[in-house]
C-alpha cells in the first residue's frame, strides 16, 4: 500500500504529527504495537500523576479531619485505569480522523521507504519514527521491595 506519510508510534509526537499531516492533505498511516497514546499516557506520566493526585486527596482529608482515611488501593488503581482508558479513547478517536489510518501492528523497515507490518508492505516517501521512550525505575534504595508500586502495575 502506498501512502504519503508513515509514522511509527502513536504517542504525543506520533498522533499530533498524524493529525497535522492529515489536516494538510497527507494520507497518513500510523503504526502502534501497543496501546494508542504511547508510554506517557499508558505507563508513565498520566498514570503516575493520577496516583499522585489520589495520594494528595488522601493527605488533604487527613489534614482537614485530623485522621487518615482508610485507603482502598484497588479503587485507586481502578481510577488510574479509568483515567488512562478515557484519554486513550480520545487518542484512538483522533486516529479515526479523515486521512489517517491507524494500524495496530509492530512495524519494521524493509528499506528506506518501505515498512512491513502484519505481513503487509507499506510505502511512503516520508517515514517518521516517533517511538518515544520507555519508563524506567530510578536508582532508589528499596525500590524493588514488596509493596512498592509503579505506574505500570
Regions found by a protein language model. Give the residues of each.
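Glycine-rich flavin
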Residues: 2, 19-26, 31-153
Amino acid at each position: 500500500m502506498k501512502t504519503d506519510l508513515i509514522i511509527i508510534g502513536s504517542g504525543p509526537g506520533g498522533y499530533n504529527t498524524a493529525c497535522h499531516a492529515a489536516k494538510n492533505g497527507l494520507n497518513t498511516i500510523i503504526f502502534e504495537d501497543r496501546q494508542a497514546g504511547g508510554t506517557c499516557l499508558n505507563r508513565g506520566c498520566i498514570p503516575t500523576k493520577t496516583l499522585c493526585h489520589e495520594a494528595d486527596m488522601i493527605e488533604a482529608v487527613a489534614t482537614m479531619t485530623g485522621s487518615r482515611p482508610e485507603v482502598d488501593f484497588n479503587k485507586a488503581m481502578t481510577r488510574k485505569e479509568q483515567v488512562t482508558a478515557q484519554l486513550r479513547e480520545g487518542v484512538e478517536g483522533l486516529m479515526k480522523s479523515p486521512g489517517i489510518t491507524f494500524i495496530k501492528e509492530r512495524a519494521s523497515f524493509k528499506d528506506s521507504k518501505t515498512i512491513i507490518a502484519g505481513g503487509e508492505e507499506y510505502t511512503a516517501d516520508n517515514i517518521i519514527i516517533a517511538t518515544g521512550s520507555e519508563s524506567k525505575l530510578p536508582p532508589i534504595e528499596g525500590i524493588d521491595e514488596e509493596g512498592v508500586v509503579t505506574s505500570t502495575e
